[in-house]
Amino acid sequence: LSLHDALPIYLTEADLANHRVDWVELLSRDFAGGSVQELPPNGQGIATLIALGILEQCGIEKHHPDSVQGLHLSIEAMKLALADLDRYVADEEHMEFAAKALLSDHYLKSRAALINHDKASDFVYGSPTQSGTVYLSAADSSGMMISFIQSNFMGFGSGIVVPDTGISLQNRGCGFVLDPKHPNALAGSKRPFHTIIPGFAMDGNGKPLMSFGVMGGPMQAQGHMQMALRIMLHGQNPQAAIDAPRWRVVQGREVVVESTFDRNTIAALRERGHQIVVEDPLQDYNFGGAQVIYRMPEGHYVAATESRKDGQALVS
């Protein structure tokens, strides 16, 4: 508190005293015979579910994730999801409506109808109502699976260390916006929008299927969608899905792809109006770091880890 008094901080002693940890209900969407689970706002996991719901409306099961059409539809769906994410998502207690409104079939169908299947488009948010990260996945012989993620944000967080403690303060307040009319406006007693999201999937019988995460700021929701498409819908081996070329939506029509992308695919996406930028994943580190544990039908597990950055799959 003495540190707080010495700095221009919005939080008050009452905010700290009234803070609570919530046991939340996961957001869920049926997908590829199972379901994908994400934490509700104030995180970005809902963008994965929005994009997957839009893709189902587009008949994505007909297109391989590496095909031009599969990539085109996936990119457009994620652009729509990110537009809604930026406009609406905040601490759910301060959102204009319940987060589930963004996942209704009626709304997702209306969003999917905006996609031109032959050409890239610019999207804005819709109207669902009328009016620095570490990831850990673990599983045991009993079938229990855990998906866990944590981050101080932006390196060592705020750069502020509480005197005489060695405790560095995180920097997630950076996720607030300064527009007082925005649902994610800076204020005390309020959680900021943030990017850290552990992913989870269930099979068609409601049993744990996959615990997964893709570290990397705004790449996380995009990476979750790409993992779900490859592993759940197209049956790819989890390690093959992690190693496959990734893409990420930046802004407007700009899409960054890894340099391992097929040249003909890049050319075809550009012909559809996507502004493609090629980056080396081993130099730019902007495509996230994935970790996956997948439960096989007989109860065994397949663990897969990232090749682009530090990561390890262990059996103990």
Question: Over which residues does each language-model region extend?
Answer:
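Internal maturation/activation junctions in enzymes
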Residues: 9, 57-152, 164-165, 172, ...
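Active-site rim segments in enzyme catalytic domains, especially the processed small/beta chain
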Residues: 10-12, 144-210, 234, 238
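Non-catalytic beta-strand/loop surface segments
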Residues: 11-37, 192
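Extended C-terminal subregions enriched in glycine
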Residues: 142, 190, 224, 233-284
